[in-house]
Amino acid sequence: MFNEINQDYYTVEEIASLPFYTEGPAADAEGNIFFTNLSGGSILKMGSGNKITEWASCDYPNGQIILQNGDHLVCDVKLKAVRRFDHKGRFIKNEIEKYCSGKEFTSPNDLVTDKEGNLYFTDSVRDKGKICYLSASGEQSIFLEGLDYPNGIIFSHDERWLYVAESYKNRILKIEMERRNVAAVSVFAELPSHPSGKKENNLPDGLAIDEDGNIWVAHYGSQAIHKLSPQGLLLLSIDVKMPLTSNLCFVNSHTIIVTGGYGEPGPGGVYKIYLK
């Protein structure tokens, strides 16, 4: 949808076509790729030869991360919970459910942990969206609220900054951290606008960070992912061929997995981008 920048820098390949819209991409140490299918109620695993199997059952899984011990944390929108599965896909427990520090959350969407194992996750609602915090020892707090549909969330490598997509503002926020609290909030980047001008075509979704500290954004409705410099400058836009681009993750420094689809609840797809 956008004029692509540096088209000789990458290739785009569809590696899966599926009945349901996909989300929550994550890669393990062996190179296996995991993703969720929301309405399909499954966490899926793609192994060698791009073979896809159901790895775990989950009511309405969205964002997903893999921890160092191999456990998966998954946002379940229907249950209003962040759920933990072991490395074999066996459900362990709900880490947090329905309430955070006494306040209800209704749409857990995406999540990230810091190096100490503290969890931050977005509650994606219009105008009153928030970021919830759950410490490794079980303490809860509302980290930030009053956001217009907070979505993808990622730390800088030194964890001085927390980035969050504010979907209905079509922008990425940059939060300065101070002892796990908010020191300051600023606009990191305003994203390109879809030619239609419709809000639903201008929704930044999942985020990822590369080894150089560049922030990558899945731009839902715009059929694109964008690469932003550590200063928030647009460096690259890629047409993913899939209008509802939901999320992305790095398998290695040259390979990106992108989830999303052509409608909700489906059909969905998974794409692989090779950076040259």
Outline where the language-model segments fall.
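Beta-rich, blade/repeat-based domains predominating
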Residues: 16-30, 57-76, 80-81, 100-119, ...
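Short loop/turn segments immediately following the C-termini of beta-strands
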Residues: 38, 77, 118, 124-126, ...
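Beta-propeller domains
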Residues: 34-53
